[in-house]
Amino acid sequence: MKKQKIPLKNSLILLLTATIWGIAFVAQSEGGDAVGAFTFNATRNLIGALILVPVIFLLERLNSKSSSDTDNSGTNSTKTNVSKSENTSVSSKEDTRTLIIGGISCGICLCLASNFQQLGILYTSVGKAGFITACYIVIVPIMGLFMKKKCSPFIWAAVVLALIGLYLLCITDGFSIGKGDALVLVCAFLFSVHILVIDYFSPKVDGVKMSCIQFLVCGILTAIPAIILEHPLLSAFKGAWGAILYAGIMSCGVAYTLQIVGQKNMNPTVASLILSLESCISVLAGWIILGQNLTTREIIVCVVMFAALVLAQLPQ
């Protein structure tokens, strides 16, 4: 059987993504209390889209300059250049269509997932929300089977190990589950769909552009219930700007873009396992920044989750 290589560069990019997201749970907890869940998510996604606009223009300019230099050094005939130009035009239209479909699909998934998560965080702790969100490590490979995406025994073992960690953290008093936990569990399913949608589109389109479109779609869709249900006032933002800016610039603009780039040509189950480290980081961030209790049980869970990640990185 041919061994499956896991790109180290992609793994490190996704690890950085998980770190930013883990800290963002603190920002979501603080910001959501100040302005409302929908208002918080709408604002941070629109900020994320806005941040990526100059980045896209800069990358386009650099690519255009590089392409121009290549053309000037070439010696192709006029006939060949015309034929190439026609093919490029057709390909460009197809790429644009794929980009728009991918961006809108990701935006809808992100809108539903992030809003269920934000609402859930209002009724449960930052650390618990982080771990329940990480249930996508189980959902992704199961859904992937229907898409003919197979996983090695090492990866399945890592999923089981991570699931044990989630059980140790979340199920403390029997099998009862609170309102906030249920909302975040729905969010985990939706993030699983989001990961698989990215897995499908990321090799085909520009990751930064697709990320920008998804934020714009998510921000606009979330703004509708924010305006109708929460009636946001500018004065309410005064105590939440720090959290909103971190969530908008880092969690959205930087981290979600890194996710799209990092997931390119990567097994979605391995990607989900790396991203699930956000749960461990969210517990530590809640402990350090918010002063929330960090129990011995939660420390053990962090170790178990890290062991699952290491297991998933072994040569397949």
Can you name each region flagged by the protein language model?
Residues 2-4, 45, 53, 57-61, ...:
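C-terminal-most transmembrane helix of multi-pass membrane proteins
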Residues 99-104, 151-162, 181-184, 205-215:
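Cytoplasmic-side transmembrane-helix entry/capping segments in multi-pass membrane proteins
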Residues 39-50, 118-149, 187, 268-287:
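Specific alpha-helical transmembrane segments that line the substrate/conduction pathway
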Residues 38, 52, 139-141, 176-230, ...:
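Transmembrane alpha-helical segments that form core, pore/gating elements
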Residues 31, 40, 44, 120, ...:
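Hydrophobic/aromatic residues within transmembrane alpha-helices
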Residues 52, 151-171, 191, 222, ...:
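Hydrophobic transmembrane alpha-helices of multi-pass small-molecule transport proteins
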Residues 6-11, 34-38, 42, 94-99, ...:
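Juxtamembrane helix-entry segments on the extracytoplasmic side of multipass membrane proteins
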Residues 15-23, 27, 55, 101-123, ...:
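Hydrophobic alpha-helical transmembrane segments of multi-pass membrane transport proteins
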